[in-house]
């Protein structure tokens, strides 16, 4: 492989920026642009050490940057190659100059995710661990971070490998049965082992799939839509949950004319919070577009926060909103409790049909804790302890596990129907291959390229 280089930190002003190199010539290329005290070279130092010096533009020896350089020699590195990390002052110009000098001396600009891809190709991590790197970067809550860390440490990989080993052992018994069909006792034993092993694998796959709903919540967040008539406090609710003024709050109905999104962490529950334009009939063409978008977002929501005005009587529009969210996960919020109550709370609870109803005065910042508790209890009836289970949160993994479950079910069905043993072998092999796709043991190169292209440059 050639030697790659990229800026590994976000571009912009900051305390430190890092240029990373990885490959067989990483140390030699770095030496060409590094000037150490008393003529020290990076090739002469011990691995896993850091050194002060300057990056210079040779042959003029013009000093470009004052740096600290980490030297990490193969194979004890993330990529299992020689790795150099040049720690520069944060900024745009100088760090770019350092990168350009490295490229001029023979490094190639890395593709997105190429450092992690090399870690995978060199056997440092498997595919599920590589995907967990991106999950860790994108984690919005402590729980999501813990789930990603568990996957990075190989918890899912170990489970998948054990299941594949069980299937492989079962296939070995099938092979014996095919090779020695004349022995009835072998056939009987094979049948018993097949049922036991296949049933056990199926149960473990089902256990993993049961974690997928909460796993996806942790990974992607709940699509949470705030709805209600104009001027009931939807934007105030968004701002209270986000703790920032993201939406315009006025007394004028229809102020929010579009969909406003924000990612928030509510007691460990990641929410993709969406504030919609008030749903009502309107002649204003701009507001009408916002209302249509609100209706579309509503259809795709995981959770609805339906806001009503505590100081007004329940309107026909309010009732229609309840009808629009029938059968969905809804929390009803009676806002403006600081004003004289006029709403029929018994009628509201009747329309809520057992779903949570909380009261708030967003103006006085009252009732937010009750709302957060309702959100948490609705989705985590028992608090998730990410250390207790292996969670599946990746859509690709979920799809593969569903296919593997069907394959093992087909194998069990074939055994029950006494189909030829070599037909059962096909289904078992299919399940074994599918599970291999999760960890990258049996996956097409184009899929690998696609997965790593989603990473940021320098990772």
Curated annotation (Swiss-Prot):
Its cofactor is K(+). GTP binds at residues 231-236, 250-256, 275-278. GO terms for cellular component: cytoplasm; cytosol. It comes from the Bacteria. Binds 1 potassium ion per subunit. Belongs to the TRAFAC class TrmE-Era-EngA-EngB-Septin-like GTPase superfamily. TrmE GTPase family. This is tRNA modification GTPase MnmE. It comes from Bacillus subtilis (strain 168).
């Amino acid at each position: 492989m050639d030697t790659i280089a990229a800026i590994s930190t976000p571009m912009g002003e900051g305390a430190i920026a890092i240029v990373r190199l990885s490959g067989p010539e990483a140390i030699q290329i770095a030496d060409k642009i590094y000037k150490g005290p008393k003529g020290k070279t990076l090739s002469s130092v011990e691995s896993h050490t850091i050194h002060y010096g300057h990056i210079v533009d040779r042959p003029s020896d013009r000093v470009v940057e004052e740096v600290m350089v980490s030297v990490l020699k193969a194979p004890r590195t993330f990529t299992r190659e020689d790795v150099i990390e040049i720690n520069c002052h944060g900024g745009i110009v100088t760090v770019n100059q350092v990168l350009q000098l490295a490229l001029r001396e023979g490094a190639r600009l890395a593709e997105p995710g190429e450092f992690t891809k090399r870690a995978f190709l060199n056997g440092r991590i498997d595919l599920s661990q590589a995907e967990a790197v991106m999950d860790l970067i994108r984690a919005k809550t402590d729980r999501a971070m813990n789930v990603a860390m568990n996957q990075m440490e190989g918890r899912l990989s170990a489970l998948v490998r054990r299941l594949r080993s069980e299937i492989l052992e079962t296939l070995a018994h099938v092979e014996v049965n095919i090779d020695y069909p004349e022995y009835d006792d072998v056939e009987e034993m094979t049948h018993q082992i097949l049922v036991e092993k296949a049933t056990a694998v199926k149960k473990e796959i089902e256990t993993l799939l049961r974690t997928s709903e909460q796993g996806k919540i942790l990974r992607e967040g709940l699509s949470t839509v705030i709805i209600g008539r104009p001027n009931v406090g939807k934007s105030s609710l968004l701002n209270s949950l986000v703790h920032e003024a993201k939406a315009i709050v006025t007394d004028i109905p229809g102020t929010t004319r579009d969909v406003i999104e924000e990612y928030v962490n509510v007691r460990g529950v990641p929410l993709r919070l969406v504030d919609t334009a008030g749903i009502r009939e309107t002649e204003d063409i701009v507001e009408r577009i916002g209302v249509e978008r609100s209706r579309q977002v509503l259809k795709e929501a995981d959770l609805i926060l339906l806001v009503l005005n505590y100081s007004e009587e329940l309107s026909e529009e309010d009732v229609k909103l309840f009808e629009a969210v029938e059968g969905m996960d809804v929390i009803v919020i009676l806002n403006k409790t600081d004003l004289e109550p006029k709403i029929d709370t018994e009628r509201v609870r009747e329309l809520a049909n057992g779903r949570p109803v909380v009261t708030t005065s967003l103006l006085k910042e009252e009732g937010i804790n009750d709302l957060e508790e309702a959100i948490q209890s609705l989705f985590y009836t028992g608090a998730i302890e990410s250390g207790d289970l292996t969670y599946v949160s990746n859509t690709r993994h979920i799809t593969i596990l569903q296919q593997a479950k069907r394959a093992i079910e087909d194998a069990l069905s074939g055994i029950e129907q006494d189909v030829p043993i070599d037909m059962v072998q096909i289904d078992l092999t299919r399940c074994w291959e599918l599970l291999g796709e999760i960890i990258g043991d049996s996956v097409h190169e184009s899929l690998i390229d696609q997965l790593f292209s989603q990473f940021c440059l320098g990772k």
